[in-house]
Amino acid sequence: PAEEIGAGAKQFVASGKIDNIDESFAIHVNSGLPVGSFAVEGGPVNASCDIFKIKITGKSAHVGRTHLGHDALVTASEVVVALQTIVAREVNPIDRAVVGVGKLNAGTRYNIVANDAEIEGTIRAFSHETRAHLKEAVTRIAKGIAELNRCEFEIDWYDAAAPVINTPELAEEFQKVVSKVEGIDNLITKYESSMGADDFADYVVNKPGVYG
């Protein structure tokens, strides 16, 4: 329920309605597959999604007297560039991860040192460990650069979804069942996992399950 807002599964789990359920299964439409195809495999199939909003507060001043200000725009720009080093230098090269910034707002006038800046972005990962590291790294780097430039720093995180990690044994059983379904003539057991998130992950964080 309410998958489109990325919060339905959390509410469902929190309500206790799946406490007595041993396993969870889900099927999702995939327009990228030909008719009659079904894809399911064990292991990570969808990435996690966390959304961050960073607020940097400096001190405005006229550009002719920049020494009196603390530039939030320059600071935010440094943060955006530095965040790109996380995947390149802090994540195992054989792992897969994303740190993306999609929004940067700063300043009010062409000749005024920016007092405020806001950055919005997302992190994606296929393991709980990498997800936790990305979150720590974004916070650490942004905070450090803000302090270096004499600016104040705030960050808010929104937990949209954990990674979807299919239980291998159940995925094999699922494949056997699907292979017997009339109309499915192309069972795909190896495919590229998606950086898109799905809140079905909340059902399989603590209990076995499969998402196909």
Regions found by a protein language model. Name each.
Residues 74-212:
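Metal-dependent amide/peptide-bond hydrolase catalytic core
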